[in-house]
């Protein structure tokens, strides 16, 4: 049997594992479609969408870390610093697991998903759309002389078709349920955990 090391885990194994979480979230959501609330479905979709989004960023077509390192950090080593597969693995896998645990908790307890969790997920979605729009525009202006004709940047497709649509649905849900000061504090906690990851 071949030795399995951290480098191999960071290449694609972590992404395959996170896509298994995507599959589990989608199956759970479909099985419980008639009993789960819309906010709970939204959180499950966030957990399911993050690995799909990371797959677009890293594999199909890939290259997001290069954009991030070049445009945001002006790195001398854009292929590997400061974002690389290991650092993104921690972020993506950690955030995916966090939202999966939140989903499972509220599914098991039957409690309503607080507005603060929806607000945190909405802010996360807005951040994804904003970052990918910025990188897409920056890439267009940087590389238009070399043939770039669109503002598409790696990750933009799932950012727009997934996180943008999901963010709009979650905003509608927050308007329907209302937000309290406690929800805003809870949102700050969720975003704080996400930013640490």
Question: Which residues fall in each region the model found?
Answer:
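The first (N-terminal) embedded transmembrane alpha-helix
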Residues: 10-30
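Terminal transmembrane helical module of multi-pass membrane proteins
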Residues: 162-197
